[in-house]
Amino acid sequence: MQSLRFRQIDPGMTLREIDSEILKYWKDKNILEKILSKGGSKKFVFLEGPPTANGRPHIGHAMTRTIKDIVLRYNTMTDHKIYRRVGGWDCHGLPVELEAEKHFGFHTKSEIVNFGVEKFNQYCRESIFRYIDEWKQVDDLIGFSIDHNGDYITLRNDYMESEWFALKTMYNSGLLYKDYTVVPYCPRCETSLSSHEVAQGYKDVKDPSVYVRFKSADEENTYFVAWTTTPWTLPSNEFLVVNPDMEYSLVEAQGSRYYVASSRAGYIFKEYREIRRMHGRDLVGKRYLQLMPFLDPPSGSLKVVAGSFVTSEDGSGIVHAAPAFGADDYQIGKEEGVEILNPVDKNGRFADPRIPWNGKFVRDANEDIIVYLKKNQMLLKSEKYEHSYPFCYRCDTPLLYYPLDAWFIAVSRIRDKLVEYNERINWKPDYLKHGRFGNFLGEAKDWNLSRDRFWGTPLPAWRCKNGHLVFVGSRKEIEDLGGKVPEDLHRPYIDEVRFKCPTCGEEMSREPYVIDTWFDSGSATYAASHYPFEKNFDPETDVPVSFITEAIDQTRGWFYVLHVIATIMFNKNAYESALSINFILDAQGRKMSKSKGNSVYALDFLNEVPPDSLRLFFLYGAPWKSKNLDKKVIDEVSRKTLMTVLNVYSFFAYNANIDNFQWNGLQLSGNALDRYMVSKVNSFVRSSRDAYESLDFHEVVRASMEFVDDLSNFYLRLSRRRFWAEGFDDDKLSAYSTLYYALKAFSEVMAPITPFFSDFIYLNLGGDKESVHLEAFPEFDSTLMDEKLESEMDRAYSVIETVRRLRQENSIKGRQPLREILIAGDMEESIIDVVKSELNAKDIKLIERDQEPIRLSADLRMDRAAPVLRSRVNAVRHKIRSMDGLEVQRQISEKGFVEIDGVRLDPDMVEISRVPDPNYAYSQTEKYGIDVFINKNIDRDGYLEGLARELVRRIQVMRKEMNLNYTDRIITHLDLSDDFLEALNKHAEYIKNETQSDSIITDKVEGMKLWEINGEPVRIKIDLAR
């Protein structure tokens, strides 16, 4: 038996079967390895944002990895050599430690210390790769084409050594410093956080808001009204702060006198009398009495000071300041040179027996403190205040602002450079450049780098008892200083390293900090290559990296820290392009979370949905817009594109094998439909290449859906009879050649987005390479493009779609010939001739607008007219409805209004509608503004022809059910009602030719299939002709 040139696929083949077949093929043929080793004349530097593998990958990770893969595959096909096409794993930090704490049942840091840092860190090391196999399995299933054999891992000594080099560089340049200050602090994790970590954890909460009266030390029966949303800080009050330029009033209310911002007095007091006004600067220096007599106020406190941060938008215009618990407060305390009152321990509990709430978590004490204030007549007003408050982005505990020693990177000193280098980055979406990301850069704060924790990259700072400091930048430097380098650079082993101080000779020990894990991931640019200790990384050519992408929250996470570190280390931006991805929501549009029970894990979902269908869905709309994860939408998008292309390929392969078609390049006969489709292919290639280059991958998907619609519902529907024609002339060769050309182009253009399906089509078309992913991305050929022809054919297609819609609206089947179609608009007669078979009408006429079977009808727009005309509105409406709409339109056109019985109606008060002749149904094409009319009347001849076509369709369905080849001849038996019998007698030859029937016999035989057509019973049986 002769082998088939083109594989004929089972009609029931699914995308799941295709994906599985191609994945097996790739593994059998080592396709990934061949992609990885593919050369190129241009360099593309990739950087994978490292996830932590101690948790399962969710559906959002699948989307991120899909977009990374699209970029990699496209650039491989466009002659780029991909540098560092590897994965990465983030290994350190609170996320890992918290999972370890859960495992052991720990709740405090002291429990970890008692258990043993060595054992704790060993568990952290083992746990981080718990789900790495699942991550790699998801990467396989989704088609992520990276080399996991070369993954960078942030816990490796080489990686951390590169970070040490960077930290020493920063220290030597004066950009890394230590300070005692108030920092964002998590009492659960007992460590400080950086500003970019804090930015990821804000929630809207309702906190108690209190207006408290502080008694003046110098004026009788006089008080300062201070406002706070943290009552727990009141025992530590040291100052009251006013804005020096704001206006304040001394008012009399409730039998006492109060200083308050002038604009806020009416909010705080229902009734008051203003005594006098002054500016905030006039209040500076005034003294007041301690509010709560529990702690000893330091010398120099309990006075009014100035602060420009005070506003009158809410509160009282006077802010209570506790320097221990606020950044602005601390700065005031520092400027005033006073000691700070801190009765709170590192667990966030009051830890001073003089305070009545000793031992209580500070935020839990708020209500008790309000009761105390009220009881002691210190409270003027109490309410709930909704505001945005920071929570630990890892453990969800409310943060405190707390005084600590900490190491900082002086980001504020390079703020101008950060903003300048941001201008070099191509952002998708572009509004992030000067929006969410750019605004954050413009307010960049010094980076709180140190963490008082256990599992992380150790801070390489050694100090002696005399305060001398040595920053180490490599393992060799430790040896040179006389220390012994441990095999593992983590705690507790690195803590045991000692050496003599090069300045005074005393023993030096390491400061017991690890660094922010964001510094780990932000160092991937260079540390993944063990820079500068190995020579496989060149900052001149490898920075900036070409492209990065992660979820929207990383604009203040990984995107930010990459940019900061590259600016400091290499004096340039970290990346050329960045694409930010929005969240995948559940089917109801809710954000997914474990607590809601609506999380979707990638592996589970990929076991239900074919990967190409999911990948296509991810780009069904811009990736920076959120999407509801809806299987119905996924199936619909897949059906309209991939399944439609599969059916087109099936049609092509079946017929091409019958005619023994062989691809020998594009061979066109001049047929207008072929020229149109070939032009469409090249337009599709051009627009898709532009979209890939601009990172608008959703535009490729949109263009592909339009292309598939043009190919299947327009080109193939109008061309299919050419494939069925006897013989093999130039016109038939041109049709095969065009269809092959279109299918192959689709497989190559869509290869980065739907890699499995594209390779399936490409391989079955007999592509030259082992995989479409080893092909070059197609180039468009401008000599084959005809924009005028495309426009004319697109207009014709829009007419066809409009006629289909009018048929459906008027219950006229597509196989029923219409008596007449009238078309008014910009259309060519020659194009109508090309598409008239699809329009299925006895008569098709191009007419002028003034020949349309339509009249204009005028009416009032009641929403506009009624308020003006009032009681006369019904009379005027009756009159305008009786007028000729054309005359109303003429008056408006000539005079700018229409006048009825002395009433002047402006154009916005009048609605003019087009009302078709009752014999016609009318609509306008969605594009191009072409008017289309179909005659709704069906005469007897047209009705009988429609019945004949219905018979043909049923016989063809039965041929398909019997798996007959197109060339198989049949004998057809029919048992018909009178109308169908009349239709058969009139159109017998047509029915024979369409169904390959040698003869049609009207009789009753065994095994006939019953159909109901137009309410009439029709029985059919077909036999192979002998």
From Swiss-Prot:
The family database entries (Gene3D superfamilies) matched by this protein are listed as:
HUPs, Isoleucyl-tRNA Synthetase, Domain 1, Valyl/Leucyl/Isoleucyl-tRNA synthetase, editing domain
Gene name of the record:
ileS
Q: What is its main location?
A: cytoplasm
Q: Give the reaction(s) catalysed.
A: tRNA(Ile) + L-isoleucine + ATP = L-isoleucyl-tRNA(Ile) + AMP + diphosphate
Where found?
A: Cytoplasm
Task: Write down the required cofactor(s).
Answer: Zn(2+)
CC per GO annotation: cytoplasm
The residues the record assigns to binding ATP are 594
Write down the species: Thermoplasma acidophilum (strain ATCC 25905 / DSM 1728 / JCM 9062 / NBRC 15155 / AMRC-C165)
The entry's protein name is Isoleucine--tRNA ligase
* EC number from the UniProt entry: 6.1.1.5
Q: Which family does it belong to?
A: Belongs to the class-I aminoacyl-tRNA synthetase family. IleS type 2 subfamily.
The broad enzyme category this protein falls into is ligase
- HAMAP family in UniProt: Ile_tRNA_synth_type2
Location of motif 'HIGH' region in this chain is: 51-61
- Residues making up the signal peptide according to the UniProt record: none
User: Which one GO biological process term can you cite for this protein?
Assistant: isoleucyl-tRNA aminoacylation
Subunit organization: Monomer.
Matches recorded under InterPro entries: aa-tRNA-synth_I_CS, aa-tRNA-synth_Ia, Anticodon_Ile_ABEc, Ile-tRNA-ligase, Ile-tRNA-ligase_type2, M/V/L/I-tRNA-synth_anticd-bd, Rossmann-like_a/b/a_fold, tRNAsynth_Ia_anticodon-bd
UniProt keyword annotation of Metal-binding present: yes
- Tell me which NCBIfam families the record gives: ileS (TIGR00392)
Per UniProt, which keywords does this protein have? Answer: Aminoacyl-tRNA synthetase, ATP-binding, Cytoplasm, Ligase, Metal-binding, Nucleotide-binding, Protein biosynthesis, Zinc
Main function:
Catalyzes the attachment of isoleucine to tRNA(Ile). As IleRS can inadvertently accommodate and process structurally similar amino acids such as valine, to avoid such errors it has two additional distinct tRNA(Ile)-dependent editing activities. One activity is designated as 'pretransfer' editing and involves the hydrolysis of activated Val-AMP. The other activity is designated 'posttransfer' editing and involves deacylation of mischarged Val-tRNA(Ile).
Indicate whether Lipid biosynthesis appears among the record's keywords. Answer: no
